[in-house]
């Protein structure tokens, strides 16, 4: 188990160092990596918020005790 954790840590640090080395070659490459990171972060936050909202609505509906969801008339 310790070997797996050590290998994961070394691979992660190695990947970060490699991305930093590639990004330092050209400002255009650095801006592309940064824009990709921003897009991924926005997507993760948006889908995380949607997931938490769905879980919260499901829990709220379960705690209210109603058998059927509210339907428009």
UniProtKB/Swiss-Prot annotation:
Protein name: Uncharacterized protein NP_1057A
GO cellular component: membrane
Record membrane topology: Single-pass membrane protein
Transmembrane helix found in the keyword field: yes
Subcellular location field: Membrane
Record has Membrane as a keyword: yes
Organism: Natronomonas pharaonis (strain ATCC 35678 / DSM 2160 / CIP 103997 / JCM 8858 / NBRC 14720 / NCIMB 2260 / Gabara) (Halobacterium pharaonis)
Transmembrane segments: 37-57
UniProt keyword list: Membrane, Transmembrane, Transmembrane helix
Predominant cellular place of this UniProt entry's protein: membrane
């Amino acid at each position: 188990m310790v070997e797996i954790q050590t290998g994961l840590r070394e691979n992660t640090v190695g990947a970060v160092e490699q991305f930093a080395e590639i990004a330092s070659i050209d400002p255009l490459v650095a801006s592309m990596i940064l824009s990709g990171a921003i897009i991924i972060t926005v997507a993760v936050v948006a889908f995380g918020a949607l997931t938490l909202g769905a879980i919260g609505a499901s829990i709220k509906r379960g705690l209210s005790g109603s058998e059927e969801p509210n339907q428009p008339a």
